């Protein structure tokens, strides 16, 4: 099975990262912001995999495991914060977070 060229893999990763960045800047809903962050993290993981496969190094797969574990931690903490904001303010608008005081 032929390998995907480096340029194509990095182009897909770049497009996914840019889409996640646009979603991060445009959306006001915290759930969509978290989803955009996940897309950006997966795009960076894809770039590591493509680069590691191109140069036949296992470092890309190691970084992929690191990125996936960081994404899981970010998702769990983000969803916990999202639930607390929804219980307190009954909205998922990101501007409600600025009203939160300790």
UniProtKB/Swiss-Prot annotation:
InterPro entries associated with the record: NADH_UbQ_OxRdtase_chain4L/K (IPR001133), NUOK/Mnh_C1-like (IPR039428)
Residue intervals passing through the bilayer: 6-26, 30-50, 62-82
GO terms, biological process: ATP synthesis coupled electron transport
Quaternary structure note: NDH-1 is composed of 13 different subunits. Subunits NuoA, H, J, K, L, M, N constitute the membrane sector of the complex.
Record function comment: NDH-1 shuttles electrons from NADH, via FMN and iron-sulfur (Fe-S) centers, to quinones in the respiratory chain. The immediate electron acceptor for the enzyme in this species is believed to be ubiquinone. Couples the redox reaction to proton translocation (for every two electrons transferred, four hydrogen ions are translocated across the cytoplasmic membrane), and thus conserves the redox energy in a proton gradient.
Similarity field: Belongs to the complex I subunit 4L family.
NCBIfam families recorded: PRK05715.1-1, PRK05715.1-2
Official protein name in the record: NADH-quinone oxidoreductase subunit K
Gene: nuoK
